[in-house]
């Protein structure tokens, strides 16, 4: 519990049309969400031109309140978008209850981003 409780998930959103993935990433860049699952987006990192010394990559990272974040990128090998969700909660009290809360938030974020991307 010294480092808090970490909840996470990887979601793969498949499609038969690779153009839908390109369009979804472009839509996220031109019309970024202001909130995901009701949680305000505090900053967006777009790795298309490189970022903090990293090579360019078709990847977007949405920082939410606190340390929660959602990362979206196309798969490099298949017609799908990959979504990574990370939620961190302070666990000074009941670790089990905190873990349940963190995973509940992970699930809410997953449902929200899946609806937003609508592949």
Where are the regions a protein language model picked out?
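A generic beta-sheet turn/junction motif
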Residues: 76-78
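Phosphate-binding and adjacent anionic-ligand microenvironments
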Residues: 1-73, 82-84, 91-119
């Amino acid at each position: 519990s010294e480092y808090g409780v970490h909840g996470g998930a990887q979601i793969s959103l498949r499609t038969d049309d690779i153009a839908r993935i390109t369009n979804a990433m472009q839509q996220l860049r031109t019309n970024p969400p202001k909130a995901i699952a009701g949680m305000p987006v505090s900053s967006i990192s777009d790795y298309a031109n490189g970022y903090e010394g990293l090579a360019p990559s078709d990847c977007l990272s949405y920082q939410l309140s606190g340390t929660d974040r959602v990362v979206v990128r196309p798969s490099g090998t298949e017609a799908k978008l990959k979504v990574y969700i990370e939620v961190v909660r302070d666990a000074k009290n009941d670790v089990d209850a905190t873990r349940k809360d963190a995973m509940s938030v992970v699930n809410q974020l997953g449902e929200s981003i899946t609806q937003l991307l609508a592949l």
